[in-house]
């Protein structure tokens, strides 16, 4: 990966859409999570991260990844994350989340900014936004894009991200991550707040949370939602977000991103922590041991596609 000066903390792969066409229950939940320091950015992939998507109508381009960051920075890889190039951005605002669906990338950020690309991330345009609040997470499911952000703001698009409307939110707390699976949208935020929608994002209800810690990201796989956040907190739900339990965590560090692929949940945290679960999110083990220099990286996001996990963090790492 080329050295990049910004905090590239968002990553999406559209290569994995091939598998999500065949296995819609393993499609992704956000894109999106938020970092715990100066940036609201998070990670999402088109089939399994902070946002999840049942992209049955989407076409994939193997090996294409897109990462967004502060100051409107956009980078793109066409070789499975081995090398990256800058892409012209239509905004100078910080970008916090990105997802893919219906052959369209959608990115969200500060001041309600929404951008979209319909040519695999090669070029981007601004979309009309219904809010001036910061948008922190975005996902795709059932042909609907849903974004979440400050003060409980929830927005949705039914026309491939061209225009957006506000949805009624049951909370005024900040929301960071949003995911989709089994015809259910789940969003997570401050003070352990969890909200869910079963009608394509039109209406939302609060769900009971097992934690009071901030929840920064959520993903979906194997009929399981997994949320992560402050102080190493990991929660999971196996009944479409109706109830949640705490999972065993290998770290006390703030967890910034989580994704799902190849029947494995992978999370990333501060101080280079990388951990995974092979038992459907019940417990997680640290896999950082033996990896060179990982303690030097402030890892902020992780994504999966084309049988490849990519993690991104501070300083363009």
Say what each PLM segment does.
Residues 40, 53-317:
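Residue-level hotspots at or immediately adjacent to binding/recognition sites across diverse folds
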Residues 1-8:
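Bacterial N-terminal signal peptides that target proteins for export
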Residues 10, 15-62:
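Bacterial Sec-dependent N-terminal signal peptides
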């Amino acid at each position: 990966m080329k050295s990049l000066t910004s905090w590239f903390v968002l990553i999406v792969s559209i290569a994995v859409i091939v598998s999500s066409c065949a296995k819609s229950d393993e499609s992704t939940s956000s894109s999106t999570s938020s970092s715990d320091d100066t940036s609201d950015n998070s990670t999402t992939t088109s089939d399994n991260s902070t946002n999840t998507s049942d992209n049955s109508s989407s076409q994939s381009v193997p090996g294409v990844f897109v990462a967004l960051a502060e100051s409107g920075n956009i980078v793109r890889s066409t070789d499975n994350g081995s090398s990256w190039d800058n892409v012209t951005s239509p905004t100078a605002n910080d970008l916090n989340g990105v997802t893919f669906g219906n052959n369209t990338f959608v990115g969200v950020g500060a001041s309600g900014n929404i951008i979209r690309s319909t040519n695999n991330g090669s070029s981007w345009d601004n979309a009309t936004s219904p809010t001036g609040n910061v948008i922190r997470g975005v996902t795709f499911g059932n042909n609907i894009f849903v974004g979440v952000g400050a003060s409980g703001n929830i927005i949705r698009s039914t026309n491939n991200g061209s225009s957006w409307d506000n949805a009624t939110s049951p909370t005024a707390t900040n929301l960071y991550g949003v995911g989709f699976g089994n015809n259910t949208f789940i969003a997570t935020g401050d003070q352990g707040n969890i909200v869910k929608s079963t009608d394509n994002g039109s209406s939302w209800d609060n769900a009971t949370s097992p934690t009071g810690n901030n929840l920064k990201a959520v993903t979906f796989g194997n009929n399981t939602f997994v949320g992560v956040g402050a102080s190493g907190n990991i929660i999971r739900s196996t009944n479409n977000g109706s109830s949640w339990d705490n999972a065993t965590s290998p770290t006390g560090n703030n967890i910034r991103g989580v994704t799902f692929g190849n029947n494995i949940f992978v999370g990333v945290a501060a101080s280079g922590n990388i951990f995974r679960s092979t038992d459907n999110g019940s417990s997680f083990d640290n896999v950082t041991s033996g990896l060179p220099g990982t303690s030097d990286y402030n890892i902020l996001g992780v994504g999966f596609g084309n049988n490849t996990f990519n993690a991104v963090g501070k300083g363009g790492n």
